[in-house]
């Protein structure tokens, strides 16, 4: 495990682990959960699941720099089962990519199980996304919006726990206006009883979508950790190694997750670029170094172009706010180039930006736009990215429905119902 201070007691000394050894059916299940966590190596520093963010190349970058466990991007269970193209593009891994959690979103137990069984031999745990607060999750009735249907959640977790060969984990958010956290604690306990063996708690509600606007409730995470007997991971406000240590110390969680801050600084968990207190000591131009290292990994692991572009903007975006000409250069080159030429010119932008950062003698950029204008641009980019992901999901679902309609039409035609086949084929074509 990458270095850092373990919270009081550590994994072996957690109150949950002690209660698990007390015996009884619940205690036996909790003991199994702790055994499963230790079998992973008791990882404390986790790359959180991120749509278009935690793909293989980025996971491997973070592992090089201190992360000791990672989640896949959120995988749509129905699409993973029914759409081969989606399945091939949304999950890739390699032998060094361990321990690894595959995260699924779903609202139907049988479909979730079928999807998970396709991957259970390639991952260490299967995770159920119960925390996504975005509009796409509301429309699809998954993620944090299943907090309104806990009976369905219980059925999904219970089925996975009974049928999979690997442990089941869950990632949740907390209920709003819930102090002293009655609903949240009951939710966590239900998941534990259903068979969840590792629980990640994001200390924000589903209404608190933008992390920059709301502080995470560490007290809620601590309350959950004290209430259940299984290992708990904490998520929220981890921007530096110091934050990770503080969150573990405060909540007693066995580990932490980080998402957006890792996108900007993949060395967030790296002891070598932090001082003894966990304060960052990396050079201002380290963003360029990470970007070029990431490009090498993208070639090695054949990463989709749109994913590369998103990551490059995250790495370099803060300094692009000062150096607009380089942002424009990058924007134009990635749209019109392919292959080795594209990567060469991306590196050229990185090299030029690195020299400018060194020359300016500052550790932070001086944006050309006002804070209000920058905030507006960030909101617009977030909305655009969410809309693009929603459109991709809708298109993939339409392709699945179209294939089903054509298959049903062919079956009807083979049975002598030609008109039915034509109708089904027509319906399928309209779904393209």
Protein language model annotation of sequence segments:
Residues 70-71, 101-103, 127-129, 169, ...:
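Conserved beta-strand positions in the central sheet of alpha/beta enzyme cores
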Residues 141-147, 210, 273-280:
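Short glycine-enriched, charge-decorated loop/helix-capping segments at active-site entrances
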Residues 113-142, 150-230, 245-246:
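Alpha/beta enzyme core
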Residues 34-44, 78-99, 132, 138-141, ...:
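N-terminal small/glycine-rich loop or linker at the start of catalytic domains
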Residues 23-39, 50-120, 329-331:
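Glycine-rich, positively charged N-terminal anion/phosphate-binding segment
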Residues 2-46, 51, 56-60, 64, ...:
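Alpha/beta catalytic cores of nucleotide-metabolism and tRNA/nucleoside-modifying enzymes
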Residues 50-52, 75-77, 105-107, 131-133, ...:
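Active-site beta-loop-alpha junctions enriched in small/polar residues
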